[in-house]
Amino acid sequence: MRRLLLCALGLLLAAAPRAAAAAETLPPLAATPPAISINSLYNGMDLTVAGKVPAGSQVVVRLAGEPTTFHMKEKGKVFGILWMNREKVSFSDAPKVFLEAASEGVAPETAAKYGVPGLAERIKAETSDPDKAALVAEFLKFQQAEKLYRDSAGQVTLAPEADGQTPFSAVLHVPSRLSPGTYSVEALAIKDGAIVARGQAAINASFVGAPAFLANMAFDHGTLYGILASVIAILGGLIISRIFQGSKSGAH
């Protein structure tokens, strides 16, 4: 019995350094710009992430929005003829935005594991349909088509090793459809397909200028916002009708 206990203790001690290595934290990441301003002219942007990983590592960089629940409707054939919305489907623990970029030495299967395909393990489909995995796969395809989820969303460049570390720089192409909130930027140091170290930073995105004014108006003064929106819509319709009337009279 004593020998068995000693063997078990030896195995635990042998595994301890490996667990410690797996939990290594990278030096602080530097993100440029440190915050994202969504103004009237915002149409997407490039986010640069720089840091250092242990020498001999490859790098995966990810940007993820806050987890949320998406409510959608599943389409199916009715009477075997018409495609219609059949029932509601909710996808929980799904990030609003998810971008991934990997250095050239990362194997495709490893990039997929830590990229969009890997989200299938965390996103849950809430529906009566028994084939939930297929629904999650379709959800991922939809988000990719909307350019909210992307693999190979940029480039990761490794610099020469120095003092046991490899500096890296990543450029992620942030989509134009970005909502205000806090976004997580994460760098993964990869060796032999496994994470040996990781680092994280937070990026805040916020409305500025006219979008901020309209958002505040909508939330804080809903009635006034509704009236102004109606007036603008009516005026826009009148202007367009005048333009068409003028073009018709000019044609005669």
Predicted regions, residues:
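Bacterial N-terminal signal peptides
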Residues: 7-16
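N-terminal edge beta-strand
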Residues: 23-42
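Short edge beta-strand/loop segments characteristic of extracellular beta-sandwich folds
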Residues: 48-54, 171-173
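Short acidic/polar inter-strand loop motif in beta-rich domains
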Residues: 68-70, 108, 190-196
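Membrane-proximal low-complexity regions enriched in glycine and acidic/polar residues
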Residues: 77-179
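Short, aromatic-rich amphipathic segments at membrane interfaces
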Residues: 173, 196-226
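Extended, hydrophilic extramembrane loops/domains of integral membrane proteins
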Residues: 177-207
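Juxtamembrane interface at the cytosolic side of transmembrane helices
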Residues: 223, 233-252
